[in-house]
A protein has these predicted regions:
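Active-site helix/loop module of the DD-peptidase/beta-lactamase fold
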Residues: 66-104, 124, 128, 157-193, ...
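Peripheral terminal and inter-domain segments
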Residues: 312-470
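Structured C-terminal helix/loop/strand segments within mature extracytoplasmic catalytic/sensor domains
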Residues: 260-329
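Active-site-proximal alpha-helical segments within enzyme catalytic domains
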Residues: 102, 148-152, 191-214, 263-280
Length: 470
C-alpha cells in the first residue's frame, strides 16, 4: 500500500483535531505502519472503554463453544442469585443473545460511569432495570447488557472472563501479555469497559476475528462464533448493522469495535486490513479511516490504479512516524509570585470535590503540586520547560469518566501564562485523558483560584472553581 494513504490519514487526524495516541495498521497479517504520539508508546497499555466489549465477546464465545453457556440461556435464571425483586414477564424472557445484540428490551442507556462509583453489587443494580420492550425486538445500546454477559460467563464457568481467556489459550496463543481488566465489587470483570491493552495486542484480536478465529493455523475461536459476532450471518435479533459488539459500515466494507473517545478496532475484509487506534478525542475515527484508507484504497484496487511504492513517500512516512509528538514545550517561564506561595499550605473553601488543602513546592526546574482530599494526599511533579514522568494517586474520577485507579503514571508540565497564572498540564499515558489545572493567584499570593478541566469526559469538561486562602 502506498505510504500516501497513511500520510493522508495522519493529515486528516491533524485537520480534524483528532488526538490520536497509538495507531497500528496491518495488511495480510503484516504490520505496514505503527505510530505512537509521544508520550504514548508501543509498550504502554491504553484504556479501551467500551472497546472492552470485544473481549467479553471472546469470553462468551469460548463459554458457548465449550458448552458452558447457550445463546438461548435466560439471563434471570443464570443470575438468579443476584435477583433482588420479583421478575417481570418481560425480564423472564431476556436471553444471552439479547444481551449480545443490545436487544434486551431496556429503555435507557446505562453507562459504565453509572456503575463505577457503586461499592455494592453491579449485577444486582443492573437486574433491577425495567424491561419495557419485548426482548429481541428493540435495539438500544447499554453497557449494562455486557456487564451481565460477563457475569453469566463467570457463573457458568467458575472463572472470570480474563481467567477464561488466559486458561483456554486465547491470550497465550495470541501473545497478549500486557493486559489488565478491571473488576466489579461483586467479583466479575467489567465486561462493558476497563481493559488496558497495547495497540499491537488489540490489532491481534481484530486479525483473529477476521481470520474466522484462526491464529497461526490454530482455531482459537470457532468460525461460527466469529461470523455471528461480526455480523456475516444475520439472526432474528441482529438484522441491523450491530451484531455481537461489532458494527458494520458501508454495506460491510468495514467493521468496528469501538470505545469512547476514539478507541477503535477496525477490520476491512476486502483489503484484509486491521487497524487499531487508541486516542483521546470526540472525533469519529471510523469515518476518518473510511474516507482516507478504506474507500480510496478499495476504489483503487477495484480500478487497478493502486500507486506503486515510492521510496520518497516511504521515507517521508518514516520521518513523520519518528516525530509524532503531543508534548508541547514553551520558553522558560517564571513569576515572582512563585516565591510568595512556595511551601505554603492553602485551605480550600467548601467544594463539591472534597478538596481540603493545596500546596506548591516551587523550584527553578519543577513545581510540586500537592492536594489533599477525602482519599488522602496526592502529589504531581510538574516540569518547567520539560515534561516529567511520575506516578500519582491524584483523585480524577470526576474528570475521568468515573475511572479512579489507586495510582496512574503521568507526564506533567508547568507553565506560567502570566505573572498571576500558573497552568499545569497532566497527560496520563494509559488513559485517554489530558487534565489542565489553571491556578490564578492574587497579587499578594494570599489567595488561589483553581479550575481543573479535561479534554474528554462523560461529565463536565470544566470543573467549578475551588478557592484557596492562606
Amino acid at each position: 500500500m502506498s505510504s500516501q494513504y497513511i500520510l493522508d490519514l495522519l493529515d486528516a487526524f491533524d485537520y480534524a483535531d483528532a488526538e490520536v495516541h497509538n495507531i497500528l495498521m496491518a495488511i495480510d497479517g503484516e504490520v505496514v505502519f505503527e505510530g505512537h504520539y509521544a508520550p504514548y508508546t508501543a509498550l504502554d497499555p491504553h484504556i479501551m472503554f467500551s472497546g472492552t466489549k470485544i473481549f467479553t465477546n471472546a469470553a462468551v464465545g469460548v463459554a458457548v463453544t465449550e458448552g458452558y453457556l447457550h445463546l438461548e440461556d435466560y439471563v434471570y435464571d443464570v443470575l438468579k442469585d443476584y435477583v433482588t425483586q420479583d421478575v417481570s414477564e418481560l425480564q423472564s424472557k431476556v436471553q444471552l443473545k439479547h444481551l449480545l445484540t443490545m436487544t434486551s428490551g431496556v429503555d435507557r442507556f446505562m453507562s459504565g460511569s453509572e456503575l463505577r462509583p457503586l461499592t455494592t453489587s453491579w449485577i444486582e443494580h443492573i437486574l433491577t432495570e425495567p424491561i419495557v420492550h419485548e426482548p429481541g425486538t428493540y435495539y438500544l445500546y447499554s453497557s449494562g447488557n455486557t456487564m451481565l454477559s460477563s457475569a453469566m460467563v463467570t457463573v457458568a464457568t467458575g472463572k472470570t472472563c480474563l481467567e477464561l481467556l488466559n486458561t483456554t489459550g486465547f491470550c497465550e496463543e495470541l501473545g497478549i501479555k500486557n493486559f489488565t481488566w478491571d473488576m466489579s465489587p461483586d467479583g466479575f470483570n467489567a465486561g462493558h469497559g476497563g481493559i488496558k491493552i497495547t495497540a499491537e495486542d488489540l490489532a491481534k484480536v481484530g486479525q483473529l476475528y477476521m481470520n474466522g478465529g484462526v491464529w497461526n493455523g490454530k482455531q482459537i475461536l470457532s468460525k461460527e462464533w466469529c461470523d455471528l459476532a461480526i455480523g456475516y450471518e444475520k439472526t432474528v435479533e441482529n438484522q441491523g448493522d450491530y451484531a455481537y459488539h461489532w458494527t458494520a459500515y458501508e454495506d460491510g466494507l468495514y467493521y468496528t469495535a469501538t470505545g469512547s473517545y476514539g478507541q477503535t478496532l477496525a477490520i476491512c475484509p476486502k483489503l484484509n486490513m486491521v487497524i487499531a487506534i487508541q486516542a483521546g478525542t470526540k472525533q469519529n475515527i471510523g469515518e476518518l479511516l473510511y474516507q482516507n484508507i478504506f474507500k480510496p484504497y478499495g476504489d483503487a484496487l477495484d480500478a487497478g490504479t493502486v500507486p506503486e511504492p515510492d521510496d520518497a513517500l516511504s521515507a517521508a512516512l518514516a520521518k513523520r512516524a519518528e516525530n509524532l509528538n503531543l508534548m508541547f514545550t514553551t520558553d522558560f517561564t517564571a513569576s515572582p509570585i512563585g516565591e510568595l506561595v512556595d511551601d505554603v499550605t492553602f485551605t480550600a473553601a467548601e467544594n463539591q470535590y472534597g478538596i481540603t488543602t493545596l500546596s506548591l513546592d516551587v523550584h527553578d526546574d519543577y513545581i510540586d503540586y500537592t492536594m489533599t482530599d477525602a482519599r488522602g494526599t496526592h502529589t504531581i511533579r510538574n516540569g518547567i520547560w520539560q515534561w516529567l514522568k511520575g506516578e500519582t494517586s491524584m483523585t480524577s474520577n470526576y474528570t475521568h469518566h468515573q475511572y479512579q485507579y489507586p495510582t496512574e503514571p503521568v507526564y506533567a508540565y508547568a507553565e506560567w501564562k502570566d505573572a498571576n497564572t500558573l497552568q499545569l498540564t497532566w497527560r496520563f499515558p494509559e488513559l485517554a485523558f489530558v487534565d489542565t489545572l489553571t491556578l490564578t493567584f492574587s497579587d499578594d499570593g494570599s489567595q488561589i483560584g483553581m479550575v481543573r478541566s479535561v479534554n474528554v469526559n462523560s461529565g463536565p469538561l470544566v470543573c467549578d472553581e475551588v478557592v484557596f486562602t492562606k
